[in-house]
Amino acid sequence: MTVPARLVTTIAAPLDPASSEAPRVLHRPGRRLLVQRGDTEVVALDLDACVAGRASEVRFPAPWPRRFGTVAVSPGRDAAVFAGVHAVRSVEASGATRWEVRHGCWYGGCSLAHSSFDEYALDEDHRYADSGSVAVGADGGLVWAHVRAPLGGDAGAEGDQELWAVLDAADGRVLGRVDTMTAASGSEHTPHPDPTRMGLSVGEGEEGSPALWGRWDGQRLTAVQIGTELVLLAVSPSGGHLLTVDVGQWSLSLHRAEDGSLLRELDARDAVPPHPRSTGEGRVYWDCDAAFVDQDTIVAGTSECDARYGAARHWLVDARGMALRGEVSYPFPVSGPVRSAGDGAWYTVSEDRTSVHLWKPAGEN
């Protein structure tokens, strides 16, 4: 069975793909942004204005090249928050630094407390440092940051300790922190509609992939580990459910957000047919990206394992029973995984990374 998809719009990427990351959509309740990071700047487009044919962009100067960290943009586009090798920095579109919180160096062989990027800009080892990540909460009031200790001049913190911290987005004050008990090579945040909740997936190379779920109650940050070999993919529109995939990419799993308990799962080997051009070698497995179309519908892909055979395949999944509804049928071939675009939509990026395509199930406005 195939399920037709409708093209909502195609948006041109604002930066040259040769010197920038692929564009991505950040969405929060009532606000959707198309964000692209280059070496010298970050561009944030108002996605809904683009859909309506009214381009609206804000550009933020980058304090360091893209290989030295990650970035998030506030829902109101008043600041971009950069997670770097030695600091988390909030930058306004004018280039002014709103605040900076320094932390331990992400290069494991370095014990120095860096005061600027210039101190290691030309060092080969720091070019390949591990990294944390950062996210801005749904209402723009909180910044969530995964960093290496010590944080903001803390005394007595272990140099190899990693922290998950909640910061005041206005002034960078550290409001709360927890020890993640991880050894990251990289990490990624998964936002929740409630700004006091957030997910964190930590990649530890061959050691594992802990998935953490955090909650800020206004006084204290708490975090629970929902798995040691899981990647958080998405949160349902209601905020009640989490979607994960195991590090082997065998199964999509639906969890209760409140406590992380497993509700249902869908094994790719049992549900997804082999690619029509498959020669029988290799296995079918899920991508490490997926999206909730609505509370009861998930769109997921097998593009990574399909790549050797041709066009990517994407699938609609009934979240209520974690059962495959059918393969998504597009009006033209698409590439790569599916990612959430909010408002019942998902997006794909063209193979040359110059365009973003927004999709909805056919028949839905």
Located regions from the model:
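Repeated scaffold domains used in trafficking and secretory/extracellular systems
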Residues: 14-29, 59-78, 105-137, 179-194, ...
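Beta-propeller blade signature
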Residues: 159-172, 211-217, 256, 311-322, ...
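Loop-centered beta-sheet repeat module
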Residues: 5-10, 15-18, 161-229
